[in-house]
Amino acid sequence: MASKLKIIPLGGLGEIGKNLTIYEYGKDMFLVDCGMGFPDQDLYGVDLVIPDISYLKANKNRIRGMVITHGHEDHIGAIPYVLKQLDMPIYATPLTAAIIELRLEEHDLLYHTQIFTKKPGDKFKLGCFEIEFIHTNHSIADSVALAIKTPIGTVIHTGDFKIDLTPIQGGMIDLPRLGQLGNEGVLALLSDSTNVERPGYCASEARVIDCFDELFKDCSKRIIVTTFASNVHRLQQIINVAAKYKRKVGITGRSMENIMRVATELGYVDIPDGVMMDMSQIGSLPRSKTVIVCTGSQGEPMSALHRMAFSEHKQVTIDAGDRVIISASAIPGNEITISRVIDELFQKGAEVIYDRNTPLHVSGHACQEELKMMLALTKPLYFIPVHGEYRMLCKHAEIGKLMGVEPKNVLVAKNGEVIEITKRSMRATSSVPAGDVYIDGTGVGDVGSAVLRDRRHLAEDGIVMAIITLSAENGKPVTDPEIITRGFVYVKEAEALMGELKRVVNESLASCERQKQRDWAAIKGRVKSNISGYLYKTTRRSPMVLPVIIEV
């Protein structure tokens, strides 16, 4: 049997999101997490990004399962798209499993997938691997780290974590078990790097409840709170404070409604009698007696808060004096959309409270001192920083060395690298495909660089179409060409330019006729080249030019 453990990250290194790591030994392999990433602003029309799973498809008979650390989209968002191509069982904690089931139901995959529910402390076998779930703290309940026992030693994969000494529910991270594993001997540690640039400790989730209390007790108007739908700890805090001040709570936003339902069914949210109220009835109460909890903390265009801000919500209108609380920090790249929503709310007379001026949100990721504690407890032989942009991985690597890991045993890896570990060495030996796969609507991977280049071109300069009608008998023009533009100029205000473009097309056709050129591709090429040259010369713009020939 092979004596080398292979760890292959397909996503999550050098980036935020898209977390997917393969563990491989001999004939057995399994996945840890299967997340999506958010598209950059220049990925026009792309809804989300998932990892390239070519390597998994080439080794599908060796896959023993998928193990999920928690229910955030950057760790579960790609699951439906992977399961459409590969069949494998999923192992997760109860709340995480319930959230995954919601996603699979949307894709008609629920009844075709085996999901095994495990709790912290449970151990189970996947081929030659034994996996143990270890309770951690994070901004979503039921988060776990993994202790992965392999034939050559134990690997700890932290997932996203923080060390919260006063958690809202679920108890503290299981530091004793991590320390016990460290004393027994940890071969390698793969640890969350998201907050490595922040010194000190991450604030406790309990800090937020005092802020909510202050904002609720002095408000005589309606309160609207938006937060991450998956943050059931935060939802519980909002419900508790609303009950304290005798306000009814309504939930709006499909993802939040779904997660609230499953979290309540599983016992992760405790709702006092008479607090919740259907959104269809909440408008009948005085505004001073209501709280609306909604999606939209990232300014998402179809979210409940966005629709409220732009007067598109069917049940809620924003009135002057309404207090809107944004209890979330901006995911990088979402700042502009959030700012637009906040501006619109201010224009409607709402009082908007957000993270820049009030401590309404705390991170779910460990800061430097917590990362040091994880290293001190586990005492790994090898250390691989994960879950972060490249500078974060480098910073975390330095902390690893500071905490006593031999410099030669610290590896800053890249997506796709095959990391081979033995009892005596760790090195990146080769690589597998690990690029981005773009999801656009129902299409998976059908948007490539050429399509994105065209979309970028259209977005920047628009399109000019030249419709040319030629005779089937002699190949000569039957009518004047028609010029159609989109995103280039307003035609009614550029009639002279349209006339000049028709002239350019006619001259191009005449030139082709003189040269007895009948090949459509050549004619289109001539027309395109001449229009492009004329437009750049006269406007200094380079729209996409698309000649279309119709034969009659």
PLM segments and residue spans:
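Hard-cation-handling environments
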Residues: E197-S327, I331-R356, L360-K516, K524, ...
